[in-house]
């Protein structure tokens, strides 16, 4: 969570004096639940990718498992944007200036980026002897979350210096997201910034050191667009009006998300193509809109589950995982892909790999509970729905 100093309220904060949901409000548990869902989908993707072998790797089961693996990164980025909006609104209520808010957000993003670089270093050291040195500079999801938070901090700083209405903040965040998506096909092809060293260009289009953009990396274009979409939605949800109409906004957003999916598919089927190179699965703005629609639909379903369904019943493993998502992301990689993998790689049936997945899930849940206890946030853990915007991953 972003941590901001407590100062006396400033005059320009009067329009934000209405309370923002507190970190203790169980209404926000759905955000952590959704982040926990991203963790579980990530676990299954990595476990089956690492451990399935033989005919199992050619099965439809494996294909759908890896298709599900396209969801966690957009989910994490989308939720990071919502988290930043929460903290910005709360900081405005406390009277923070645009500069203070911007600096704190940029600093938190820089911390996540530093952790991403440290993670790459750890992976390189553990894999010493067979990993290429260029892996140190790979643009992975942690790097992109950090960069995205920094960019959101810059944007909030700039906008708040001139306009402080929620509508302005949400509209500009959404416009930035659409601009990132619209520029992605060009920056991956005809507008590539080839003048930059590849470690820097890779943050723009994921070129790495391979000469062409790589779809398995997470460059700013288009991935940061999901964070700004989350930021836009967060500003609406955490506004005074949004809090009063929370259920209606989320559910209408889910319906709008489904409509957006169909609209984007219709748009993509038009014969006119405005980009010189068409790549639906990696840079198409239409595919970006489809995934945004899917995120909105998932958010609505998760909200309903946590407010009116079993997700609101006492202890939730997904909420727990969502509160420590950075930790379980970091640790599970070593037990799935690393030298201390709990199963032999590419050597198991679906049943064997599923047993390994269950082991990873339970182990990461236990680790999460231990971390929560040690941090003093779990008294008691069972029966408690602590929400929010705990970590940006």
Residue ranges of predicted features:
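Alpha-helical transmembrane segments and their immediate juxtamembrane cytosolic regions
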Residues: 2-5, 12-393
């Amino acid at each position: 969570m972003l941590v901001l100093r407590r100062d006396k309220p400033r005059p320009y904060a009067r329009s934000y004096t209405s309370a923002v949901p507190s970190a203790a409000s169980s209404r926000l548990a759905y955000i952590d639940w959704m982040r926990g869902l991203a963790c579980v989908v990530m676990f299954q993707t990595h476990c089956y990718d690492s451990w399935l072998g033989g005919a199992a790797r050619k099965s439809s089961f494996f294909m759908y498992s890896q298709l599900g693996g396209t969801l966690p990164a957009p989910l994490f980025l989308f939720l990071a944007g919502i988290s930043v909006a929460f903290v910005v609104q709360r900081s405005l209520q406390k009277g923070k200036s645009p500069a203070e808010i911007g600096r704190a957000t940029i600093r938190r993003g820089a911390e996540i980026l530093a952790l991403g670089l440290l993670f790459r270093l750890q992976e390189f050291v553990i894999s010493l002897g067979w990993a290429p040195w260029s892996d140190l500079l790979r643009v992975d999801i942690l790097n992109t979350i950090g960069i995205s938070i920094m960019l959101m901090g810059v944007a909030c700083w700039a906008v708040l210096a001139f306009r402080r209405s929620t509508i302005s903040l949400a509209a500009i965040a959404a416009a930035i997201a659409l601009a990132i998506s619209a520029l992605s096909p060009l920056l991956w092809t005809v507008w590539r910034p080839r003048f930059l060293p590849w470690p820097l260009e890779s943050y723009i289009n994921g070129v790495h050191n391979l000469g062409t953009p790589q779809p398995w990396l997470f460059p700013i274009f288009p991935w940061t667009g999901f964070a700004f979409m989350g930021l836009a939605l967060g500003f609406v949800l955490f506004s005074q009006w949004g809090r009063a109409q929370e259920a209606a906004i989320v559910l209408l957003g889910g319906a709008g998300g489904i409509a957006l999916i169909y609209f984007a598919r219709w748009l993509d089927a038009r014969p006119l193509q405005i980009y010189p190179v068409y790549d639906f699965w990696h840079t198409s703005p239409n595919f970006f809109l489809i995934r945004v629609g899917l995120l909105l639909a998932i958010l609505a379903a998760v909200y309903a589950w946590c407010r009116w369904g079993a997700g609101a019943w006492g202890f939730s493993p997904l909420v727990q995982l969502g509160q420590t998502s950075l930790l379980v992301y970091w640790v599970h990689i070593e037990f799935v892909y690393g030298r201390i993998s709990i199963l032999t790689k590419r050597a198991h049936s679906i049943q064997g790999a599923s047993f390994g997945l269950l082991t990873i899930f339970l182990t990461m849940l236990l680790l999460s509970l231990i971390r929560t206890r040690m941090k003093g946030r779990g008294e008691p853990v069972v029966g408690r729905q602590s929400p929010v915007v705990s970590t940006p991953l």
